[in-house]
Amino acid sequence: HMEEDIATIKKAMTKISDLAGRTDAQSLNQIARWVTTKESHAQNVQETILNYFLAQRIKEKQKGDEGRQKYVDQTLLLHQLIVVAMKCKQTVDQSRCDAALKIVQNFTNSYFDDHGIDHIKSLKKG
């Protein structure tokens, strides 16, 4: 889901860059729509992290608790993804999308077990 949002953000960045410099009304309208699309999908990434992973799935671990380091690592990855999604809203630099995909992959590897990762891969193929 987040990977699809990031792919859409990257496509929007490409379209905005392609239309840059044009001043006719239709091009300006298309740019506005692509900016809205880009920002909407970046917001989707942030909301998925906040409302699903941080609020529901990632359980807080106190210092000394088993699994504390994994909790810290996952929380840091999610924070990085929230920040890079924000930066995607502010720019058309596609390297931000590449960074976001890398963070998603790192989080996926940390969050899911081997069975879950295999299931995700099978969904992408099918």
Set out the residue ranges of the language-model regions.
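Mature extracytoplasmic or organellar-lumen-exposed domains after removal of signal/transit peptides
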Residues: 1-25, 31-126
